[in-house]
Amino acid sequence: MGLKTGIYSGSFNPIHIGHLALANWLCEFEGLDEVWFVVTPHNPLKKKDDLLDDSLRLEMAQAAIDGYPKFRVCDIEFYLPKPSYSIDTLRTLSRNYPNRDFYFIMGADNWQLFPRWKEHEKILQDYKLLIYPRLGFDISIPAIYPNVKKVDAPLMEISSTFIRNAYQADKDIRFFLPEGVRPYYYKI
């Protein structure tokens, strides 16, 4: 059995304290050894128009986790064909890191869309999934999916969209952003 490594894929547009709190909770209370923040250049189910620059999102993610040994930023999707599909990311990571057991971290909102994902049945078969709560989304996991687990992480309704909108409305959002991210974000 390898290192239990959570794969937390996202646009991180920008990364915020909700992302970090969830990842920390998964390490401390679900027993993950590490969480890798996989910055996604293009989620096939979202518009790319609203995304901050790829390299800026990657830099902000790195600044957000700086000094925390259980977190790592991963840019693997920058080198894979676009748009980014989770099955391709997971396969590549599994090949490159055979001594790790990968756990795919997903919100309840994405769990409801999961049947639309590329090769979702293969993900269910080959990887463990950790589904965290999101306000307004039920987490129903059929018994036929033994690799899928609902986690009881605290509900934090902070989103990157909320942060971008608040920033554009000239609101003080400093406490929603990790300290290392603030200098980057206020320059945008």
UniProtKB/Swiss-Prot annotation:
Q: What is its EC number?
A: 2.7.7.18
Q: Does the keyword Disulfide bond apply?
A: no
Does the entry feature the keyword Lipid metabolism, yes or no? no
The cross-references to InterPro entries, in alphabetical order and at most eight, read: Cyt_trans-like, NadD/NMNAT, Rossmann-like_a/b/a_fold
Keywords from the named record:
ATP-binding, NAD, Nucleotide-binding, Nucleotidyltransferase, Pyridine nucleotide biosynthesis, Transferase
- Identify the domain of life: Bacteria
Residue intervals passing through the bilayer: none
Pathway named in the protein's UniProt entry: Cofactor biosynthesis; NAD(+) biosynthesis; deamido-NAD(+) from nicotinate D-ribonucleotide: step 1/1
What family is reported? Belongs to the NadD family.
Read off the HAMAP family from this record.
NaMN_adenylyltr (MF_00244)
What is the name attached to this protein's record? Probable nicotinate-nucleotide adenylyltransferase
| Source organism of this protein record | Parabacteroides distasonis (strain ATCC 8503 / DSM 20701 / CIP 104284 / JCM 5825 / NCTC 11152)
